[in-house]
A protein has these predicted regions:
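N-terminal edge beta-strand
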Residues: 2-35
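Short, solvent-exposed loop/turn positions at domain surfaces
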Residues: 26, 53, 68-69
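Residue-level "contact hotspot" at macromolecular interaction interfaces
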Residues: 29-31, 58, 74
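Envelope-exposed proteins and targeting segments
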Residues: 34-36, 46, 65, 90
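Asparagine-centered strand-capping/turn motif at beta-strand->loop junctions
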Residues: 40-44
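Short, surface-exposed beta-strand/strand-loop-strand elements in extracellular ectodomains
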Residues: 47-56
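Extracellular/periplasmic metallocenter environments
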Residues: 61-98
């Protein structure tokens, strides 16, 4: 299955970082590896909640939070939706590649 958000950026390093902005998240789509972990950075004035599989993060305004599990510990390869709820409801697509 291919992501719908368009071009997916390759994620480098230990973390796949999702930036929650007042308008749209950045990036909209990321290719992630099994050993990487999710990090959510909240660039808004309100607390946001992020949900992906078994991972739920609550992130205060202008703060960040990191999942304790690597993607491969709770997701199967494929395209997954990181749901973000705050001032707006939005999502980031994460493409877990094996």
């Amino acid at each position: 299955m291919e992501p719908t958000a368009g071009a997916c950026a390759e994620t480098q390093g230990a973390y796949a970082v999702a930036q929650v902005n007042p308008d749209v998240p950045s990036p909209r789509c990321q290719k992630v590896g099994e050993e990487q972990k999710l990090r959510v950075v909240n660039n808004t004035e309100q607390t946001v909640k992020a949900h992906l599989g078994q991972v739920d993060l609550t992130v205060g305004p202008h703060q960040e939070a990191t999942a304790s599990l690597a993607f491969g510990q709770y997701l199967v390869p494929g395209v997954h939706r990181l749901a973000i709820v705050g001032q707006l409801e939005t999502a980031v697509e994460l493409w877990l590649r094996s």
